Amino acid sequence: MQNQKTVKIGNIDVANDKPFTLFAGMNVLESRDLAMRMCETYVEITDRLGIPYVFKASFDKANRSSVHSYRGPGMEEGLKIFQELKDTFGVKIITDIHTEAQAQPVADVVDVIQLPAFLARQTDLVETMARTGAVINVKKPQFMSPDQVGNIVDKFAECGNENIILCERGSCMGYDNLVVDMLGFGVMKKVSNGSPIIFDVTHSLQNRDPSGKASGGRRSQTVELAKAGLATGIAGLFIEAHPTPDKALCDGPSALPLDQLEPFLKQMKALDDLIKGFEHIDIK
């Protein structure tokens, strides 16, 4: 069996052969009060279930389909909210950046910085992120095969940063649809020498109305897709929730209703424990 790397986020060990870590929160920071409420809910539930947890939110959705769509509060206000969440709940935080200038200021506050799928091949951004020394979550682009993510890992390694997590978020299937290749998880483990793989279930559920200006989604299938991913033996799940998904300011159609978070996580933990309790079968 290939050795699996462990990436440490504070006291959390993230690895494909360890209990899954939950990277979850809200798509975009809609308000300070909502962020506080949601983070408190996540922390209470994950503490109760014994699930390692990292809070996720974006301060700027720079790649919205429409110029009129809500993007977020911006970096300065977003980092203030993140710091308050850390001070209040003692939580680890992941957020995404889109420009080189954002890398160090964001890394000074949060625990994991995320390289967006649409920017994953931008070498200057990769180099700047690598130099922060932070843990990096790389979103696999929808247009990239699982084999090619090894090149991104190599770029970070050349810049001296091997604290890399890889995130599956679906692949383009024709126009306006995403599918998840379950064989891809094993391929990404192999080409990255055992780097932790996490599964962005929420964004893998996106689909689009060709005439629309925002992504649609299939949140009714969240449970089955998440279970399928965990069954491959991965390091974590990436989930976005909302108390009222139909009123969310971004990606509501794919968001898990917040009141269903605990029963969802109970099933995910039970499945992950089962899968990782099996003896590995190495088929050549």
UniProtKB/Swiss-Prot annotation:
Disulfide bonds: none annotated. One of its GO terms (cellular component) is cytoplasm. Pathway: Carbohydrate biosynthesis; 3-deoxy-D-manno-octulosonate biosynthesis; 3-deoxy-D-manno-octulosonate from D-ribulose 5-phosphate: step 2/3; Bacterial outer membrane biogenesis; lipopolysaccharide biosynthesis. Its EC number is 2.5.1.55. Keywords: Cytoplasm, Lipopolysaccharide biosynthesis, Transferase. It is found in: Cytoplasm. GO terms for biological process: keto-3-deoxy-D-manno-octulosonic acid biosynthetic process. GO terms for molecular function: 3-deoxy-8-phosphooctulonate synthase activity. Its main location: cytoplasm. Pfam families: DAHP_synth_1 (PF00793). The keyword Cell wall biogenesis/degradation does not apply. Belongs to the KdsA family. NCBIfam families: KDO8P_synth, PRK05198.1, PRK12457.1. This is 2-dehydro-3-deoxyphosphooctonate aldolase. It comes from Aliivibrio salmonicida (strain LFI1238) (Vibrio salmonicida (strain LFI1238)).
